[in-house]
Regions:
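Feature captures the catalytic ectodomains and active-site-proximal regions of enzymes
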Residues: 1-359
Length: 359
């Protein structure tokens, strides 16, 4: 191997897992990729077709041309349908089984820990289980994922540096046993806008509606703090310790720990995919791993048209990546879970994923 290129198309599932009938009945019938092809008016993905996607999907809108790569179907190992854990699995580790509890379950322990460490902690609304730390940081449930899996630490970065937000996130991580704590923030947004975007879901989870708050719009930074993740068993750290280069791009650099990695923050799909091509220009030996996040955001927004638009951008760059590959390079394309924009709700769906390999 000279270079391995890993592209994760966030949430591009290919059909519900067999166990959902018992553990997630709301996901019965989910098939993100198929329903995208069923519903969208325009979609052209010739490079996915070349790599064999229709050998898996068998959809009438796609051609049955002979594939130039290898293909397969992957089952999720983790419980639920989560980006963070999905990425850990892709990169080589299996996290410990976390508790699945809402933030209200740990809130008093978190308040005690933060106050002991000198932080100001308030409960702005007594009937809503979120807290405000140091007048600028909201700690609450993540309302974009499964019940009791993730807590968000959200802040306006024009008023507080991200390292302080991360410090608060790490203190919360020390106390709670859920799957993930995410420290995040953006520029050109106020704490008032963040507070005004707090919503309560039908299942009782209360948290910041991140897209509505504006934190994604400018200067977005996040760091995902996992429960029981061992980066020493991930391919990125293993290669780095053997003096291979490691490039992490987009959401991948948010969720994967690797001390010596070159990191490229990006949400915009064009930027993510262009960064992969640019990394290929200077990297001689190593791994480039990138995540396309806007597909997942389109799934949350139940926006079939936007999802297809982002997928076509990915397809365009896959063609360019293949043309730039050298003899010993290898390309992997996969997904981490599903997020069917036609299912009728805005959360992830527990789906199988595809694997396309070229090289």
């Amino acid at each position: 191997m000279k270079r391995a290129i890993v592209i994760v198309v966030d949430s591009l599932g290919i059909g519900y897992m067999e166990d959902v009938i018992k553990i997630r009945p709301q996901d019965m019938g989910a098939n993100t990729f198929k329903h995208l092809l069923d519903k969208v008016e325009e979609i052209e993905i010739p490079n996915f077709e070349k790599l064999g996607i229709n050998k898996i999907l068998k959809h009438p809108r796609l051609s049955n041309r002979d594939n130039i790569g290898s293909y397969g179907i992957l089952n999720l190992e983790h419980y639920g349908a989560d980006s963070f854990v999905g990425h850990q699995e892709i990169m080589g580790t299996k996290p410990k089984k976390p508790l699945m509890e809402p933030f209200s379950y740990f809130r008093e322990d978190v308040i005690k820990k933060l106050r002991e460490d000198g932080h100001k902690v308030e409960i702005p609304e007594k009937d809503k289980p979120y807290i405000l730390v140091d007048d600028l940081v909201v700690v609450a449930d993540n309302i974009e994922t499964d019940y009791g899996q993730i807590y968000n630490i959200t802040a306006p970065l024009d008023y507080i540096p991200f390292d302080k937000v991360l410090d608060i996130g790490e203190k919360v991580r020390d106390v709670v046993k859920v799957n993930r704590v995410i420290a995040l923030g953006g520029e050109n947004v106020s704490i008032e806008e963040i507070l005004n975007s707090i919503e309560t879901r039908e299942d009782g989870l209360t948290g910041v509606n991140s897209p509505k708050s504006g934190v994604y719009n400018k200067g977005y930074i996040s760091r995902h703090l996992g429960y029981g993740v061992n980066p020493e068993k991930q391919i990125s750290t293993i290669l780095s310790k053997k003096d291979y280069e490691v490039g992490l791009i987009g959401k991948m650099q948010d969720v994967i720990q690797c001390e010596n990695a070159n990191r490229t923050p990006a949400v915009d799909t064009e930027k993510v995919m262009k960064s992969v091509v640019e990394s290929m220009e200077y990297m001689e030996n190593g791994i480039i791993a990138a995540t396309v996040q806007e597909t997942d955001l389109a799934g949350h927004g139940q926006d079939v048209k936007k999802y297809a638009e982002k997928l076509m951008i990915v397809d365009k760059y896959i063609g360019l990546i293949m043309s730039e590959m050298k003899e010993e390079d290898i390309l992997f394309i996969t997904a981490d879970h599903g997020n069917d924009p036609t299912i009728g709700f805005s959360q992830h769906t527990r789906e199988k994923t595809f694997l396309l390999v070229y090289g």
